[in-house]
Amino acid sequence: MSKTIAINAGSSSLKWQLYLMPEEKVLAKGLIERIGLKDSISTVKFDGRTEKQVLDITDHTQAVKILLDDLMRFNIIASFDEITGVGHRVVAGGEYFKDSALVDEEVIQKVEELSLLAPLHNPANAAGIRAFKELLPDITSVVVFDTSFHTTMPEKAYRYPLPTKYYKENKVRKYGAHGTSHEYVAHEAAKLLGKPLEELKLITCHIGNGASITAVDKGVSVDTSMGFTPLGGVMMGTRTGDIDPAIIPYLMQHTDDFKTPEDISRILNRESGLLGVSEKSSDMRDIHEAMRAGDAKAQLANDIFVDRIQKYIGQYLAVLNGADAIIFTAGIGENSVTIRKLVIEGISWFGCDIDPEKNVYGQYGNISTPEAKVRVLVIPTDEELVIARDVERFKK
């Protein structure tokens, strides 16, 4: 038996889960928030307890030290020697990483180089990797890429209709994201449906603050909504999703807001989406609360959000030539009864329908009506478990 930590490092956060492997038993989980800010918060959950402390955490290395100290302080482990592996989620692996990889300096440098493809994510991912490498240098350390699952896309799906030299020289193409989540829920869907994954056509909808839709045929990704970066695809909490590229030079010429590449990235990635349209919040719960109070901007933000998801589902029905099931996962997909209801109501023409009562109470499983030809499933994602499994694979 061994203990493995799965790590998801954000720019100011570090989410973790400690597993007993290969039993896949969760021993503890936690979240360190506001890294680099005053009043950082470390939360640890184990044995039915929740322990929280507020302190100043300057960087990811200090965050990892606190994580490890907490494991000892709460007697979750008796010695650091019990930890035999760590797996790190990395958003962008580009064309370079087609599978997970053992961490060395070359791999870390490559992750940092690929930050152009995920400027909000890869730098933080690399910081988490370096912190663990410094503090636990001898354990099996593995990077698991969001993009790996999508390397099966055919060229017609991942190429953009730009001059070929930009693909050859600059690697401009669709890479996608959320691959570990899409892969996990596809496998779980096959179990729920009682059929081999290789016989199924699935549309997986990872809908959280970041959101992406994937067409899965016979267990492999054949198309996905996120593109060259996680900015593409459906509308998100603070990201635009797909827009006409000509909008950018137009606004550069006619406003003072779009003067530098940093301005463009900030507005499209951090100030748009639900937040930009509603002018209120990037959180769907806040949007729905405002809608109930009659807020027209919140209503419009919700309507655009639903519309873009419906359009991608329709697109992938064409790509797959039909579907056996649509799967909702991630924060909004798993928890928003309203979004699931609205999305499916607008596309019921092809044979999917949800049972209202199952939708309200269904946090896992089939929420379809008995006569529905296309099943609608709710499956909580577990990206951390996928990461832990990959670490075990590299230990062997």
Swiss-Prot record:
Annotated residues for binding of ATP: 15, 206-210, 283-285, 331-335
UniProt site (Transition state stabilizer): 178, 239
GO molecular function, one term: ATP binding
Pathway: Metabolic intermediate biosynthesis; acetyl-CoA biosynthesis; acetyl-CoA from acetate: step 1/2
E.C. no: 2.7.2.1
List of residues binding Mg(2+): 8, 383
One family name in Pfam for this protein: Acetate_kinase
Residues binding substrate: 89
Reaction(s) this enzyme catalyzes, per UniProt: acetate + ATP = acetyl phosphate + ADP
Cofactor binding annotation: Mg(2+). Can also accept Mn(2+).
Localization, UniProt: Cytoplasm
Record's GO cellular component terms: cytoplasm
Cofactor: Mg(2+); Mn(2+)
Key word NADP present: no
Superkingdom: Bacteria
Oligomeric form and interacting partners: Homodimer.
Similarity section: Belongs to the acetokinase family.
Function as written in the Swiss-Prot or TrEMBL entry: Catalyzes the formation of acetyl phosphate from acetate and ATP. Can also catalyze the reverse reaction.
Stated name of the protein: Acetate kinase
Source organism of this protein record: Streptococcus gordonii (strain Challis / ATCC 35105 / BCRC 15272 / CH1 / DL1 / V288)
Chain's gene name: ackA
